[in-house]
Protein backbone atom coordinates (compact mmCIF):
# COMPACT_ATOMS: atom_id res chain seq x y z
CA UNK A 1 0.00 0.00 0.00
CA UNK A 2 2.90 2.38 0.69
CA UNK A 3 4.09 2.05 -2.88
CA UNK A 4 0.68 2.98 -4.24
CA UNK A 5 0.48 5.93 -1.85
CA UNK A 6 3.84 7.24 -3.07
CA UNK A 7 2.80 7.12 -6.74
CA UNK A 8 1.81 10.62 -7.78
CA UNK A 9 -0.76 11.39 -10.52
CA UNK A 10 1.04 10.95 -13.84
CA UNK A 11 3.93 9.30 -12.01
CA UNK A 12 5.16 5.76 -11.44
CA UNK A 13 7.61 3.77 -9.35
CA UNK A 14 10.26 6.36 -10.21
CA UNK A 15 8.64 8.62 -7.60
CA UNK A 16 9.05 6.16 -4.73
CA UNK A 17 11.63 6.63 -1.99
CA UNK A 18 14.62 4.27 -2.21
CA UNK A 19 13.36 2.01 0.61
CA UNK A 20 10.21 1.17 -1.39
CA UNK A 21 12.00 0.40 -4.67
CA UNK A 22 11.67 -3.16 -5.88
CA UNK A 23 14.94 -4.95 -6.61
CA UNK A 24 13.93 -5.49 -10.24
CA UNK A 25 13.68 -1.71 -10.76
CA UNK A 26 17.15 -1.11 -9.35
CA UNK A 27 18.67 -3.18 -12.15
CA UNK A 28 19.40 -1.51 -15.49
CA UNK A 29 16.93 -3.71 -17.40
CA UNK A 30 14.12 -3.01 -14.93
CA UNK A 31 14.48 0.74 -15.29
CA UNK A 32 13.13 0.67 -18.84
CA UNK A 33 9.61 -0.18 -17.64
CA UNK A 34 8.56 3.35 -16.77
CA UNK A 35 4.78 2.92 -16.69
CA UNK A 36 4.42 0.03 -14.26
CA UNK A 37 2.95 1.06 -10.93
CA UNK A 38 1.83 4.22 -12.69
CA UNK A 39 -0.96 6.43 -11.50
CA UNK A 40 -3.26 8.04 -14.04
CA UNK A 41 -3.70 11.80 -14.12
CA UNK A 42 -7.03 13.55 -14.74
CA UNK A 43 -5.43 16.02 -17.16
CA UNK A 44 -3.70 13.36 -19.28
CA UNK A 45 -5.00 11.03 -21.95
CA UNK A 46 -5.99 7.65 -20.51
CA UNK A 47 -3.56 4.79 -21.08
CA UNK A 48 -4.25 2.02 -23.55
CA UNK A 49 -6.47 -0.43 -21.71
CA UNK A 50 -4.89 -3.88 -21.77
CA UNK A 51 -6.22 -7.19 -20.51
CA UNK A 52 -4.40 -6.60 -17.21
CA UNK A 53 -5.69 -3.11 -16.39
CA UNK A 54 -7.09 -4.21 -13.02
CA UNK A 55 -3.57 -4.72 -11.66
CA UNK A 56 -1.70 -1.72 -10.26
CA UNK A 57 1.70 -3.12 -11.20
CA UNK A 58 0.94 -3.90 -14.84
CA UNK A 59 0.94 -0.42 -16.32
CA UNK A 60 -0.36 3.07 -15.67
CA UNK A 61 -3.62 1.78 -14.22
CA UNK A 62 -3.61 3.43 -10.80
CA UNK A 63 -6.66 5.55 -10.04
CA UNK A 64 -5.75 9.28 -10.18
CA UNK A 65 -6.83 9.92 -6.57
CA UNK A 66 -7.69 6.69 -4.81
CA UNK A 67 -5.07 4.15 -3.77
CA UNK A 68 -6.19 1.35 -6.07
CA UNK A 69 -6.16 0.13 -9.65
CA UNK A 70 -9.02 0.72 -12.05
CA UNK A 71 -12.23 -1.24 -11.63
CA UNK A 72 -13.73 -3.30 -14.44
CA UNK A 73 -16.41 -0.65 -14.97
CA UNK A 74 -13.84 2.19 -15.12
CA UNK A 75 -11.80 0.30 -17.71
CA UNK A 76 -14.96 -0.35 -19.72
CA UNK A 77 -15.90 3.34 -19.62
CA UNK A 78 -12.42 4.34 -20.82
CA UNK A 79 -12.91 1.86 -23.68
CA UNK A 80 -16.22 3.67 -24.42
CA UNK A 81 -18.57 0.84 -23.47
CA UNK A 82 -21.96 2.19 -22.36
CA UNK A 83 -22.16 2.50 -18.56
CA UNK A 84 -24.96 -0.08 -18.40
CA UNK A 85 -23.26 -2.63 -20.68
CA UNK A 86 -23.26 -6.14 -19.20
CA UNK A 87 -20.32 -8.41 -19.91
CA UNK A 88 -22.05 -11.58 -18.76
CA UNK A 89 -25.46 -13.13 -18.63
CA UNK A 90 -27.53 -12.27 -15.58
CA UNK A 91 -26.77 -14.56 -12.66
CA UNK A 92 -23.39 -15.72 -13.97
CA UNK A 93 -20.46 -15.38 -11.57
CA UNK A 94 -18.04 -12.52 -12.19
CA UNK A 95 -14.55 -13.69 -13.10
CA UNK A 96 -12.37 -10.57 -13.15
CA UNK A 97 -9.74 -12.12 -15.42
CA UNK A 98 -12.33 -13.07 -18.06
CA UNK A 99 -14.09 -9.71 -18.08
CA UNK A 100 -10.84 -7.71 -18.08
CA UNK A 101 -9.76 -9.79 -21.08
CA UNK A 102 -13.01 -8.91 -22.90
CA UNK A 103 -12.54 -5.22 -22.14
CA UNK A 104 -8.82 -5.10 -22.88
CA UNK A 105 -9.07 -7.03 -26.15
CA UNK A 106 -12.06 -5.09 -27.43
CA UNK A 107 -12.02 -2.57 -30.21
CA UNK A 108 -13.46 0.43 -28.35
CA UNK A 109 -17.15 0.57 -29.30
CA UNK A 110 -17.00 4.27 -30.16
CA UNK A 111 -14.03 3.66 -32.46
CA UNK A 112 -15.91 0.80 -34.13
CA UNK A 113 -18.90 3.09 -34.59
CA UNK A 114 -16.78 5.85 -36.17
CA UNK A 115 -15.07 3.38 -38.52
CA UNK A 116 -18.43 1.86 -39.46
CA UNK A 117 -19.93 5.28 -40.19
CA UNK A 118 -16.89 6.18 -42.29
CA UNK A 119 -17.22 2.98 -44.33
CA UNK A 120 -20.94 3.59 -44.77
CA UNK A 121 -20.31 7.19 -45.90
CA UNK A 122 -17.63 6.06 -48.35
CA UNK A 123 -19.88 3.31 -49.71
CA UNK A 124 -22.82 5.70 -50.10
CA UNK A 125 -20.69 8.26 -51.97
CA UNK A 126 -19.21 5.54 -54.17
CA UNK A 127 -22.66 4.15 -54.92
CA UNK A 128 -23.86 7.67 -55.82
CA UNK A 129 -20.84 8.21 -58.11
CA UNK A 130 -21.45 4.88 -59.87
CA UNK A 131 -25.13 5.70 -60.31
CA UNK A 132 -24.24 9.14 -61.75
CA UNK A 133 -21.73 7.55 -64.14
CA UNK A 134 -24.34 5.04 -65.25
CA UNK A 135 -26.87 7.81 -65.94
CA UNK A 136 -24.29 9.79 -67.97
CA UNK A 137 -23.59 6.70 -70.10
CA UNK A 138 -27.28 6.28 -70.74
CA UNK A 139 -27.67 3.18 -68.60
Question: Residues of each region from the PLM?
Answer:
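C-terminal target-recognition/interaction regions appended to catalytic cores
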Residues: 1-139
